[in-house]
UniProtKB/Swiss-Prot annotation:
Any one annotated GO CC term: nucleus
Ranges for domain KRAB: 4-76
Record keyword Ubl conjugation present: yes
Chief location of this protein within or outside the cell: nucleus
Protein name: Zinc finger protein 181
Localisation per UniProt entry: Nucleus
Gene responsible for this protein: ZNF181
Length: 571
């Protein structure tokens, strides 16, 4: 059965609500929240990410949250159940809308799941000895019931009223034994399925009172009370797609959107859609430009508290979550879980159009843009559009010539981290990926996969203009520039343009005089790897390949596919 998450039992206060609590109530709140988190960790282990409110409590900071205004359509399901509630104690003269009443109802609702485990009930009993009657703010009454209600039943929880309310007389049948009990509480009920029988016990000199064996609440009426059984609440709504279970139909419906891809919440500013109202609320902050969360180390501000938490790990450098397979460490447990899929090759996200599966959901979203042709990210310099923001960022470095990733071995710089990682394999000469057909080794799995297409002659990428097919998508893009005449790569020294970035890199060595390819036999250096390969044949005793002579000699022979130029023909 799926476990209760910390968010299911978490209690949030605004700054104003936090100010209403006394110091004793605040201490009690901190104890309960920390114990909630420790209980979840003891059961789930690494699968529980430390919430931000726990971090604040451990640092001795106040855990109040900023108020968020939700539109009417975004109000969570539980809030609508609490609206227009009809209290059975309307004759009471205490203030229904007092701050204390609002806080207690809020705490009781959100501590509902917390109070249902035996371990947590024992912890509450310990707190009673420490904090006395204040503990009742954090525990709903739990009464014994013979039958569990259906999940569709709408019911209210017992609300404990503390002594700071004005005293009043409760109407029947809700009189409470006043002997040794300064707390009054109401039983709120609505549309309950069936009646449950409460144990009758003799108390106060033979007078029969209804007594709950869980909460100890006593009543003066000997009638059976209609209450839900909260101790054994089951998650009876199961997702037919992944098997995950939920306690409410509304939560299952919200979860189902993950599989269907339904996104009913649309941003009016940019048209972006979301599957949850909370995600839309979070997104709207990006348009307002508001960044209320500021890093105390460097002063950088963020629009979301989770972004600030992630950023702060860059200052501490703490990476407590280590992969048992490769030893790689991570600052967040979610990153570790995502990384583990690389070892297990688990691919949860499948494209419904072509059936291709991916390890990460972001990879699936990126892939689906190939089918839709969507390219929302446009370069302001040249107008070229991209399907991913990362591709646009990488492209813009062509115009700025920005290269920020430097190799610590040879001090060579690269415009992207992936290029640096690929380059560093030259120094290590490690090639762990071997082709089973020709025994050729590669330093990257992607390179091996690309090489395997040469054996099976797979060419899935076809030019729509001339019909020529290619093994790799990058080769098709490069070929397509022959038809369009596009040459986006320009040399900042002489202004010459090229269709491929590699051709620009080779050309720039003319200006810099760089010759990175050195012969191990004689020490001669070359600007191109192909020139080094041709030179090494001299040492090996090989004869260079001869080229059939043409009738009319040419000063320049330009090949239309690769743009390589030749000053003379080889005889």
């Amino acid at each position: 059965m799926p476990q209760v998450t910390f968010n299911d039992v978490a209690i949030d206060f605004t700054h104003e609500e936090w100010g209403w609590l006394s110091s004793a109530q605040r201490d009690l709140y901190k104890d309960v929240m920390v114990q909630n988190y420790e209980n979840l960790v003891s059961v789930a282990g690494l699968s529980v990410t430390k919430p931000y409110v726990i971090t604040l409590l451990e640092d001795g900071k106040e855990p109040w949250m900023m108020e968020k205004k939700l539109s009417k359509g975004m109000i969570p399901d539980w809030e609508s159940r609490w609206e227009n509630k009809e209290l059975s104690t309307k004759k009471d003269n205490y203030d229904e809308d007092s701050p204390q009443t609002v806080i207690i109802e809020k705490v009781v609702k959100q501590s509902y799941e917390f109070s249902n485990s035996k371990k947590n009930l024992e912890y509450i009993e310990k707190l009673e000895g420490k904090h006395g009657s204040q503990v009742d703010h954090f525990r709903p009454a739990i009464l014994t019931s013979r039958e569990s209600p259906t999940a569709d039943s709408v019911y209210k929880y017992n609300i404990f009223r503390s002594t700071f309310h004005s005293k009043s007389t409760l109407s029947e049948p809700q009189k409470i034994s006043a002997e040794g009990n300064s707390h009054k509480y109401d039983i709120l009920k609505k549309n309950l399925p069936k009646k449950s029988v409460i144990k009758n016990e003799k108390v106060n000199g033979g007078k029969k009172l209804l007594n709950s064996n869980k909460s100890g609440a006593a009543f003066s009426q000997g009638k059976s009370l209609t209450l839900p059984q909260t101790c054994n609440r089951e998650k009876i709504y199961t997702c037919s797609e992944c098997g995950k279970a939920f306690g409410k139909q509304s939560i299952l419906n919200r979860h189902w959107r993950i599989h269907t891809g339904e996104k009913p919440y649309e941003c009016r500013e940019c048209g972006k859609t979301f599957s949850h109202g909370s995600s839309l609320t979070r997104h709207l902050i990006s348009h307002s430009g508001e960044k209320p969360y500021k890093c105390i180390e460097c002063g950088k501000a963020f629009s979301h508290v989770s972004s600030l938490t992630n950023h702060q790990s860059t200052h501490t450098g703490e990476k407590p979550y280590e992969c048992m397979n490769c030893g790689k460490s991570f600052s967040r447990v979610s990153h570790l879980i995502e990384h583990l899929r690389i070892h297990t090759q688990e691919k949860l996200y499948e494209c419904r159009i072509c059936g291709k599966a991916f390890i990460h959901r972001s990879s699936l979203i990126h892939h689906q843009k190939i089918h839709t042709g969507e390219k929302p990210y446009e370069c302001r310099e040249c107008g070229k559009a991209f399907c991913c923001s990362s591709h646009l960022t990488r492209h813009q470095r062509i115009h700025t010539m920005e290269k920020q990733y430097e190799c610590n071995k040879c001090l060579k710089v690269f415009s992207s981290l992936s290029f640096l990682v690929q380059h560093q394999s030259i120094h290590t000469e490690e090639k762990p990926f071997e082709c089973q057909k020709c025994r050729k080794s590669f330093n990257q799995l992607e390179s091996l996969n690309m090489h395997l297409r040469n054996h099976i002659r797979l060419k899935p990428y076809e030019c729509s203009i001339c019909g020529k097919a290619f093994s790799h998508r990058s080769s098709l893009l490069q070929h397509h520039r022959i038809h369009t005449g596009e040459k986006p790569y320009e040399c900042i020294k002489c202004g010459k343009t090229f269709s491929c970035s590699s051709n620009l890199t080779v050309h720039q060595r003319i200006h810099t005089g760089e010759k990175p390819y050195k012969c191990n036999e004689c020490g001669k250096a070359f600007s191109k790897g192909s020139n080094l390969t041709a030179h090494q044949r001299v040492h090996n005793g090989e004869k260079p390949n001869s080229v059939v002579s043409v009738e009319k000699p040419l000063d320049y022979m330009n090949h239309y596919t690769c743009e390589k130029s030749y000053r003379r023909e080889t005889v």
